[in-house]
Design a protein with these regions (language model features):
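Conserved, well-ordered alpha-helix/loop/beta-strand core segments that scaffold catalytic motifs
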Residues: 18, 118-171
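Short, solvent-exposed loop/turn elements at domain surfaces
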Residues: 70-74, 144, 323
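Small/polar-residue-rich segments within soluble enzyme cores
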Residues: 1-131
Length: 406
């Protein structure tokens, strides 16, 4: 038939290299072909190994999935024995540790006659299994983390905002790290998926569901998402303020109205709360916006201070760069004047391309152009917990403890 002819033509790379005509064949069909070789000359039915995921959806965004090797991957790994149709790690640990997990393919040498018919099997080299890769994930913690995420999303979707509309809550992410070495204890992104659907080739229906789902179950929000960290960033601003000389821990900043003005624009506490005289400890305890707005303003306007002091401290805690995790992640954005100019370039509707005091004020409370991933934020807080030691993250137990001091 045309379908079979097309498959043979697409995969044929040599006169004696087998062409895969079908997979996931029913067992009854497999047995029938084996029992009636005279009816199917040149056709062999064989059982192939297939990746199994006994934990199902658990830790799917860490584990990742395999899939049929792409043309680009085939070219890049030409010398490693890969063939069209082979499975290849596409995401997560499956991709990061492909070389360890794959093993080696088997080999069969055949003798053929002048007409290309097989006369005998000369030799057979059996395939070998790949290596085990031990992860740092605690399965129990991972399970609780994923269950809590799902419950949180469902609760949010059942909650109305100030306008009376239910929250959209398309997804969520959570990360648990060991602050002593940066290893990942749990990392979850919701919604998730079952990597088993990719093993042996994903069906069109399953692919349509996964790739077209508006809530993006394949997207790892924990590592690749970029979000404004909000008040969780205030500790970075506090460290910058003290380290760069913008404030002393015991200094009080007056807050008599719940707002400050920057270029005639009011910047206020949530619900315009008033906290009166506020030192650093109190500012962190009550999450005073006015206190941190003031620090952001000082960095931009006060003579003798490093105008990008907050940005520099943020980068020492890992914001704006990869965490080093093997499965890949987003660097995020620590904005400054150069970044804003790049955004404005070629965009006549962008507005003011200069870095203004208001930009720094927004940055000080984790807003504006600042974007971080949940993993970056967790790693920064692990750095706080370990006395300023910021490690590169890893999910593989054999990874080294790479760190720097913030």
């Amino acid at each position: 038939t045309d379908v079979l002819d097309n498959r043979v033509a697409a995969q044929r790379s040599g006169p004696f290299r087998p062409v895969e005509l079908a997979r996931d064949v029913p067992e009854a069909t497999l047995v029938y072909i084996k029992e009636h070789p005279d009816l199917f000359p040149g056709v062999e039915a064989e059982v192939r190994s297939e990746r199994s995921y006994p934990l199902g959806e658990l830790a799917a965004h860490i584990v990742g999935h395999v899939g049929e090797i792409t043309e680009e991957q085939l070219k890049a790994n030409k010398s490693k024995g890969y063939r069209p149709g082979d499975e290849f790690g596409q995401e997560g640990v499956e991709a990061a540790y492909e070389a360890d997990l794959r093993g080696t393919a088997g080999k069969r040498v055949l003798e053929v006659d002048a007409k290309g018919r097989v006369v005998r099997t000369v030799s057979v080299v059996p395939p070998t299994s790949g290596n085990d890769v031990q992860l740092t994930i605690d399965v129990d913690v991972q399970r609780v983390t994923e269950e809590s995420l799902a419950q949180g999303v469902f609760a949010a979707r059942a909650t109305k905002d100030r306008s009376g509309q239910f929250f959209r809550a398309p997804g969520a992410a959570a990360v648990v790290l060991d602050p002593d070495d940066g290893s990942v204890v749990a990392l979850a992104s919701y919604p998730t998926f079952d990597p088993a659907v990719f093993a042996g080739g994903i069906s069109e229906q399953a692919a349509d569901r996964l790739y077209n789902d508006a809530d993006r179950p394949l997207f790892n929000r924990a590592t690749d998402g970029g979000y404004a960290p909000g008040s969780t960033f205030k500790l970075i601003t506090a460290i910058a303020g003290v380290a760069k000389g913008a404030v002393r821990p015991t200094d009080s900043i007056a807050d008599g109205t719940g707002c400050i003005k920057v270029a005639k624009q009011p910047f206020c506490n949530a619900q315009k709360a008033i906290f009166y005289d506020t030192n650093l400890t109190k500012a962190l305890t009550v999450s005073s916006d006015v206190y941190f707005y003031t620090l952001g303003q000082r960095f931009d306007t006060q003579a003798g201070l490093d105008a990008y002091g907050i940005q520099k401290i943020a980068r020492t805690f890992g914001f704006g760069s990869s965490t080093g995790i093997e499965i890949g992640d987003s660097a995020g954005v620590v904005p400054d004047g150069d970044y804003k100019k790049k955004l404005a370039a070629g965009n006549p509707d962008f507005g003011d391309p200069g870095w203004r005091t208001g930009d720094n004020v927004n940055l000080a409370v984790g807003q504006g152009f600042l974007l971080v991933s949940p993993l970056q934020l967790a790693n920064a807080y692990a750095g706080f917990a370990s006395g300023g030691k910021v490690y590169e993250n890893h999910a593989g137990a054999q990874a080294g403890n790479r760190r720097h001091d913030a």
